[in-house]
Amino acid sequence: MSDTSTKTTLPNEEKFKDLMDLPYSELESIDDADFWAHYWAVWNANNPCVPGGPFVPNPEQEWVLQLMDEGKSIFINSPAGTGKSALVKHWCSKTTTKNIGLTSTTGISALNLGGSTVHSFLGIGLGVDTVDELYDRILKNHDKRELWLRLDVLVIDEVSMLQPELFDKLERLARKLRSSSERFGGIQIIATGDLFQLPCVGNDSSLIVDSKKFKKCIQVTIKLRNIVRQEDAQFKAVLNKVRVGLVDEHVEQVLKSRFGKTKSLPSNIRPTKLFCTRKSVQDINEKHLNKLAEMGYEFREYNMEFINQECPISFEYIVQNFTRNSTTPETLHLCLQTQVVLTYNQSPYLVNGSRGVVVDFTEEEYPVVEFLNGTTQVIKPHKFALHYTSRRGKTQQVGYAVQIPLKIAYALTIHSCQGLTIDYAIIDLNDCFEFGQAYTALSRVKTLDGLFLKKFDFGVIQPHPRALEYEQQ
């Protein structure tokens, strides 16, 4: 990947003005970083964004809206902050003649989008069952069966975090449920994401574009270029370089200027703390709980209960595997004023990832949580199904884990905040272990002034090799 700071010859001013008047579809194929930097600088200066105002699409977004209106299945593979989610929400709001499924791969990004997780919306549970098992499951659920049959468009935000094997499974399931030989059963696919951000958790080195079905379903792949989350040209340039793993002297200089700046934060600002690992997040959360204890708040303890349903192998092994991978803690301590996050969907508006504060407890000792969207809800214990997969690939339910679906949330992992925009963030990148993790974290923040970094080794900034390969194709 070439250094985007390298100077190339720009069109003369007269020719550039002529190009600005052309339809974006005629310019889209131009692969010149300096041209696009100049193009968007001029366009943004003449069309300033109004904070809180209505969504006004720019030329490249207008082009994408036209493709969606035409019924094209598209993949918007674009940098963080280019308005992918806002664009999709705008199209869905103005498209009233189609049944649209608005989904994302994570709870937090689904909440940000105003939709549901793809697993919840399509009724596939964890998605671990075979196509035939999922088919039987959906046939037994009248509402989900009707949903699949009526669906015209399926939006999948943050699709780069979806396992390619699961997409293949969904494509086959769609054709089977709808008795159709068309790709994805004739459903239009609108997928958005960024291959340079975090890939799906627990997967090998493959990406969504390694799915054979995905390649066949997608008719147009789009790269949006105009970053709207950050306005500072210098910060944009740094993020564009970090995205592809280009760490030059300028990148180091700018990021080092944000080391150890937390003391300059106003006292009324509570920045979001982002960490690479669950362990670091747990340590911060425990620190805040200890402060609440010192203030005299009374804690309630909730322990996960496990129910065995004739498991064919060691049930202890099943339990250990579940607790190791579950986002719901085995032991949960809560008191008034504890900041929490949901770990299981409660409603279309309260989903896995919704953040809130404990404001009361019921007579049964269930926590009452006031969420950021203003909703207050009693959170009761949930039964999490425990599964076992045989060597032949047969998956069966072997028991339950019962727990209050909450966890402490004073700090977040970088994985859990992909797709979000954050005003102020304290980021610790010292334990980066995944391709794209550093870029994902840095690109959450709107301004350099809102970015506060712990010192880190710049060697942790690494793009996914397959993402680079795909970008260069």
From Swiss-Prot:
Gene Ontology molecular function: any one: DNA helicase activity
Highest taxon, organism lineage: Viruses
InterPro entries, A to Z: AAA+_ATPase, DNA_helicase_pif1-like_DEAD, P-loop_NTPase, PIF1_helicase
CDD domains noted in UniProt: DEXSc_Pif1_like (cd18037), SF1_C_RecD (cd18809)
One Pfam family it belongs to: PIF1
Family: Belongs to the IIV-6 030L family.
Protein's UniProt name: Uncharacterized protein 106R
Species annotation: Invertebrate iridescent virus 3
